[in-house]
């Protein structure tokens, strides 16, 4: 070891000779693609249990028998595995949204499949054109969700008897009122003179009567006022904040200031428009009057909408500390998300999320690395919506100088020196989210294209499964076909697509079920008739006959009958999720090289009965055609009674346990082989590799996975030509353990005087 010291010293080096071992792998992750009512689209999402499935992708639905997909996934999860679920796309699948005018957007205008898609579309850094809020992902699930947004548009509401004919004429004008008050200090008092300056941020035709205790809409008006500053008698202007019960607030009465009487309305050129004087009948806190709609209805009909006061759930929005430090104002806003129709939580009016203290400033943060910018915060933290951009009708809430309105007031820009415009209180309802539109007839054929369907086309399902083709992107051990509610040819096409993905990966098994029509005849009125066993046998054999021959596929014999607790009904569900689940359970209780079939390990969960319980002769026909029968066995229940793969020729790999043994060995040893990359192909490296692999194989042999093995990794297969090509070769010979499929029991009767030695071997 070179020390590389020019003067006396000590060099410490550490050598790790423990590197290199074969780590066992576990095959418990499935992959499934299907139509769901909600959730990210075309993004494999890890689901650990049924509750995760429910929260992420919604409940099973009877429309287009979508429950088949959902219950296949649920069945697999019941055996202890995890599932990467992909929600299939559709050309008519759209997000619900609200456009910037506060009206629902057309569904065709927007599709955001997932957070990743949101970022790919550039919305992480840019606003969404014409959209204020959008549902987190496509579908009608979001329709009826209410969104409340509030900022500090105003401080006070002044009830007045006179307003301009066009209410918008005064918005942005200034208001003043004389002040004569004493401010307490430390050991002294300060005389406050001059006038209070504010800006009109809203004018409406509703207000309070002269008595001040009755809300009316007759010849009355309301001015919404934002307090800006105090101007002293010496004309020194000082920014101030509104004080609900203090000095800095506008009051009723006829107090005077130099040249003015009562509250004055000033143009942006500084000219007096009018003196309101005694016509100001009331002065109320603006924030205390703001309401949040909590249930869906017609905003124009008060009796149809439930409300709560904003002040009961959030603090008054003002200016964030981040903005204050940068000379900005009025950036704070709150966002509340409410289940307006009870579709999400089950209770209309439930507050789903409350996001407070957010900022309109694009660079705003609560702390380093924790954005408070409203759009980025919602992207990172909301389960229901994305922020699109500021609503239209942003009102100026400050002056740039004197009485000149602030012009640089837009949301979604950096905070430095900006007086952000205000929108006040916004009550939105998300609508126009669209589901799949490809409805099916009772017999599985494509029906009339209408809204509200829950069937994805085979091409879209295939696109979803292609996401699993690259084994480096997503680790899956089982690919589930899911729903078989397709016509025969479409189901065969989908099955071949799933098998093709497994063949490409070489590390996963595809589990296939026959099409629904092979077993069941559905009617337009919802009744179901089970076909005869003879018809089913012919249908099942005919379905599998043209499917690709592959040892990476497993074929089952049908459907089970199970209870759907979400709809309080029994459903017919394909068995592909159960067969994959049996493999998971076998991994957990035994090892991958044990067969998942039989009474010991092949019990099907959550099954009341089968649509098809094949007889012995029918099982013979199925098994010779690569199909694994699932049967009812008295005393044992419903069990898997076969362990063949979909390989169409005689081979060790025509059995599930052998195929899974080799997948286990290949995955584990290939992972260990990565440590040999970029090493020298010499005797030391080769010996090290053999010493890594042999103990692993010896352990598998001790656990009954293989009967014998040999590892060849020396100069006989690593020739000079191999070495010169920068290659490394190891040949591993395996004698796999075989599962018992056929048992022969012979009972021989002999005469009393016959010795057994005379007849043993002769019968």
Predicted regions and their residues:
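Structured, hydrophobic secondary-structure cores that serve as assembly/anchoring elements
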Residues: 1-107, 117-118, 131-134, 330-334, ...
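Extended assembly-interface regions of large multimeric machines
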Residues: 1-229, 234, 241-244, 258-336
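Short amphipathic beta-strand/extended segments with alternating polar/hydrophobic composition
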Residues: 96-97, 109-115, 142-150, 196-200, ...
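Serine-centered coil/turn micro-motif
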Residues: 139, 235, 370, 492-493
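Short linear, low-complexity motifs centered on an aromatic residue
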Residues: 150-155, 348-357, 492-502
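Short, cationic low-complexity segments
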Residues: 153-158, 176-178, 358-367, 751-763
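Surface-exposed intrinsically disordered loops and tails
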Residues: 160, 182-183, 205-212, 231-239, ...
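Extended N-terminal export/anchoring regions of large proteins
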Residues: 172, 284, 290-402
């Amino acid at each position: 070891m070179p020390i590389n010291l020019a003067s006396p010293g000590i060099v410490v080096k550490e050598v790790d000779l423990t590197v290199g071992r074969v780590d066992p792998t576990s095959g418990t992750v499935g992959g499934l693609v299907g139509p769901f009512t909600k959730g990210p689209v075309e993004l494999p999402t890890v689901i650990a249990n049924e509750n995760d499935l429910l929260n992420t992708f919604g409940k099973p639905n009877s429309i287009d028998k979508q429950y088949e997909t959902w219950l296949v996934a649920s069945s697999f999860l019941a055996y202890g595995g995890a599932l990467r679920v992909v929600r299939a796309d559709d050309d008519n699948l759209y997000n619900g949204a609200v456009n910037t005018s506060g009206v629902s957007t057309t569904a065709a205008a927007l599709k955001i499949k997932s957070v990743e898609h949101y970022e790919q579309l550039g919305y992480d850094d840019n606003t969404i054109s014409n959209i204020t809020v959008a549902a987190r992902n496509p579908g009608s699930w979001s329709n009826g969700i209410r969104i409340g947004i509030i900022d500090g548009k105003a401080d006070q509401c002044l009830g007045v008897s006179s307003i301009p004919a066009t209410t918008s004429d005064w918005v942005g004008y200034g208001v003043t009122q004389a002040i004569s008050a004493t401010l307490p200090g430390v050991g002294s008092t300060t005389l406050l003179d001059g006038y209070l300056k504010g800006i009109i941020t809203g004018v409406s035709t509703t207000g309070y009567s002269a008595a001040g205790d009755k809300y009316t809409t007759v010849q009355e008006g309301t001015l919404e006022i934002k307090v800006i500053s105090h101007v002293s008698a010496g004309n020194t202007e000082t920014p101030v904040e509104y004080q609900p019960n203090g000095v800095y607030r506008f009051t009723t009465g006829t107090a005077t200031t130099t040249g003015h009487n009562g509250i004055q309305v000033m143009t942006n050129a500084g000219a007096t428009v009018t003196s309101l004087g005694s016509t100001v009948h009331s002065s109320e806190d603006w924030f205390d009057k703001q309401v949040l709609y909590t249930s869906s209805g017609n905003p124009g009909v008060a009796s149809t909408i439930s409300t709560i006061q904003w002040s009961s759930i959030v603090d008054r929005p003002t200016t964030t500390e981040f903005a204050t430090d940068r000379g900005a104002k009025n950036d704070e806003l709150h966002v509340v998300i409410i289940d307006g129709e009870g579709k999400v939580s089950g209770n209309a009016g439930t507050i789903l999320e409350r996001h407070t203290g957010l900022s309109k400033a694009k660079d705003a943060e609560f702390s380093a690395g924790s954005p408070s910018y409203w759009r980025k915060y919602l992207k990172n933290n909301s389960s229901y919506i994305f922020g699109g951009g500021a609503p239209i009708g942003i009102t100026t809430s400050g002056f740039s100088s004197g009485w000149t309105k602030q012009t640089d007031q837009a949301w979604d820009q950096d905070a430095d020196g900006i007086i952000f415009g205000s929108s006040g209180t916004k009550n939105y309802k998300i609508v126009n989210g669209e589901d799949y539109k490809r409805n099916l007839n009772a017999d599985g054929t494509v029906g009339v294209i209408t809204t509200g369907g829950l069937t994805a086309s085979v091409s879209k399902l295939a696109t979803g499964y292609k996401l699993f083709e690259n084994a480096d992107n997503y680790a899956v051990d089982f690919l589930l076909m899911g729903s078989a509610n397709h016509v025969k040819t479409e189901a065969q096409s989908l099955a071949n697509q799933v098998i093709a993905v497994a063949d490409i990966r070489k590390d996963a098994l595809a589990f296939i079920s026959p099409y629904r029509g092979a077993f069941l005849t559905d009617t337009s009125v919802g009744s179901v008739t089970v076909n005869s066993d003879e018809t089913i046998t012919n249908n099942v054999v005919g379905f599998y006959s043209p499917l690709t021959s592959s040892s990476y596929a497993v074929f089952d014999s049908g459907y089970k009958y199970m209870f759907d607790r979400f709809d309080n009904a029994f459903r017919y569900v394909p068995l592909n999720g159960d067969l994959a689940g049996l493999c998971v359970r076998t991994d957990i209780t035994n090892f991958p090289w044990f067969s998942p079939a039989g009474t010991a390990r092949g019990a099907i969960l959550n099954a009341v009965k089968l649509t098809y319980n094949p007889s012995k002769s029918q099982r013979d026909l199925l098994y010779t055609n690569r199909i694994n029968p699932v049967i009812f066995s008295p005393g044992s229940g419903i069990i898997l009674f076969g362990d063949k793969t979909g390989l169409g020729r005689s081979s060790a790999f025509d059995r599930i346990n052998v195929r899974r043994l080799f997948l286990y060995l290949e995955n584990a040893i290939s992972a260990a082989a990565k440590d040999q990359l970029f090493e020298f192909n010499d005797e030391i490296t080769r010996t090290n590799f053999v010493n890594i692999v042999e103990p692993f194989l010896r352990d598998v042999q001790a656990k009954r996975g293989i009967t014998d093995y040999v590892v060849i990794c020396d100069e006989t297969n690593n020739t000079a030509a191999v070495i010169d090509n920068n290659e490394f070769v190891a040949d591993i010979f395996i004698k796999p353990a075989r599962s018992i499929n056929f048992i022969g029991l012979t009972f021989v009767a002999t005469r009393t005087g016959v010795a057994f030695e005379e007849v043993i071997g002769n019968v």
